[in-house]
């Protein structure tokens, strides 16, 4: 329903509520030319609700993110613009998180939004913004970060079950 992040270090999992922070939000809003007070935390941009909200801000039409994905696949210019905005925001945020947490082991994306996004993502745009604004040494680090998508649904439940079985 939003944006969460966890860091795995050894046998420890550190969960965060990164989506409810405004870390980097001002820079994203400026880059994406979002001039609305409706975007106050990261998940107001980087989530299914965020995609819908950006579409509504741009067009005046309230549409679910799933339909925006479909419209994008069918060549709708407004939907493509919003998916590109999401792609840029997602790439920049993952890049910053990768550097903040030294994601040498890579990034695993989970959730239906990540799975749906993978099918329509402009990978060149993502890669450009994943590295954009970074120094050469940091680009070198980021180029080594693998990004994968967990294609299995309900991954959070499997994680919870694994935790319960360990206590």
Identify what each model region corresponds to:
Residues 1-38, 160-167:
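Phosphate-binding/catalytic loop of phosphoryl-transfer enzymes
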